[in-house]
C-alpha cells in the first residue's frame, strides 16, 4: 500500500539532517532547497512543500511544490503551487505512484497548480490524468557567443555524447581566439549582488505581471539559492551544484538616477535575464554586451518576446549563431477556469522555479 505524506514549513525544517533522511536510498530534497522553501514569503504555514510516497517504511517517490500567488486585474488573488520536482524510484514503477502524488498535491492546493520545464513523457502523464490544460508556450532564443559544441552535439547523436570530453576540449581550445562581436555601450551601470533599498524603492513602484513580484520575493531569490558551488547533494537527481554560479541585479542610470534594472543569473557561463523593469527596453539590450564580456558569457537564453525583438532590431548583441525553442506550460483546469478565458499570463523568464535552477 502506497502512503502519501506531506511536509509543511514546520515539518520540513531540519528534515535533511534527520536520521530518517539519512536512511533514504535517494534524497527527496536538497539542504539548500529545504532552507529556501521554508523562507519563501509566499508559502503559508499550512502549505505542503514536499510530498513523500512510502511503501511501508521505504521511500518510493516524491513531489516538490513551490507555492506562489497569481492575481486577476481586479486584484483577486489565487494561491497555487508550481510543480518543482517529481521522481519515482525505478524499483517501484508501475504502481501509479506519480499519479497518487499528483492527486495529493491537487487536493492540498484546491486544484490550483501550474507546471513548466517538463519532459515529453511527463507531459503525457499530466495530460492523461485529466487535471491539466496546455497554456501558450513562451518562445525562446539562445544566443551563442563562443563555441559550445559540447552542449549542443551530445543531444543530437549518441556518438557525440560518448565523445563529449573531446568535444569539450575542442571548445576550450578554440574559444580563446573567438572574439566577442558585440560592442559595449557607454551606459552607466552598477552591479548589486545583494538586495538594497535603492532596488526596493524602484521596483515596488513598477508595473508587475500577474504574479506581482515585490521586493520580498526578490530579496528571497537572491538570499536563498538552490545551487551550491561547494558541494553536490548526495543521491539527489535535480539541480543542487554548479561549478560556477552567480546571481545579481544590473542597475542602469541616467544623470545618476536609476531608470532600469534587471536580474541576471550566470551558471557555467550561461546567462539568463530572469526579470527586468525598464522605462525603455532598448537600454537593457544595449547594456547586455558589457555583461556578456565582463562575465565571459558563452551563451544567453531569453524567453521574453519584447527583449528578443529588441535584440533583433537593435543588433546590439551579436552572436555566432542562435537556436530557437520554446518553454511549455500546463495549468490545472480548475485554476484556468477561475482566472477566466481572457486572462493574460505574461510569465517572466524567472517565474516558477526557473530563478533557482
PLM regions: where:
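Conserved acetyl-CoA-binding loop-helix of GNAT-fold acetyltransferases
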Residues: 88-108, 280-293
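Extreme N-terminal starter segment of soluble prokaryotic enzymes
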Residues: 1-3
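Active-site/acyl-donor-binding loops of N-acyltransferases
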Residues: 112-168, 224-225, 234-240, 247-248, ...
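Conserved GNAT-family N-acetyltransferase fold
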Residues: 51, 61-63, 81, 86, ...
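Acetyl-CoA-dependent GNAT
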Residues: 56, 65-73, 264-268
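An N-terminal, globular interaction/scaffold subdomain
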Residues: 41-43, 49, 63-76, 111
